[in-house]
Amino acid sequence: MIQQETRLKVADNSGAREVLTIKVLGGSGRKTANIGDVIVCTVKNATPGGVVKKGDVVKAVIVRTKSGVRRNDGSYIKFDENACVIIRDDKGPRGTRIFGPVARELREGNFMKIVSLAPEVL
């Protein structure tokens, strides 16, 4: 579960290393987000020469959470870290590579470009 002020690792090569959640998108007064949800973030730590800089306000989709998610068959999937991928307005990733596994739930959110770039889909 991701909420305001949560810090997440960035799982792409857009130049950001760590982001801080500003807002969870999708409904009035929505408090938490899970895998596949879009959030508004600010970049807290960035690599030099990257596409995004420190202080930029960006949109991101959550690809891994420590709390995990329950699937329809009754199984749970959890990860070791909270991670996101920075996206453009058309739901495509800003970077050209995705690092680490991503959850299968991104398919239902129409993030097929992220799923196809990921090295592993769990």
From Swiss-Prot:
- Swiss-Prot/TrEMBL keywords: Ribonucleoprotein, Ribosomal protein, RNA-binding, rRNA-binding
Q: Which GO terms describe its biological process?
A: translation
**What InterPro entries does the database record attribute to this sequence?**
Ribosomal_uL14, Ribosomal_uL14_bac-type, Ribosomal_uL14_CS, Ribosomal_uL14_sf
**SMART domains documented for this protein:** Ribosomal_L14
Cysteines joined through disulfide linkages: none
Its job: Binds to 23S rRNA. Forms part of two intersubunit bridges in the 70S ribosome.
Family membership: Belongs to the universal ribosomal protein uL14 family.
What's this protein's name?
Large ribosomal subunit protein uL14
Tell me the name of the encoding gene.
rplN
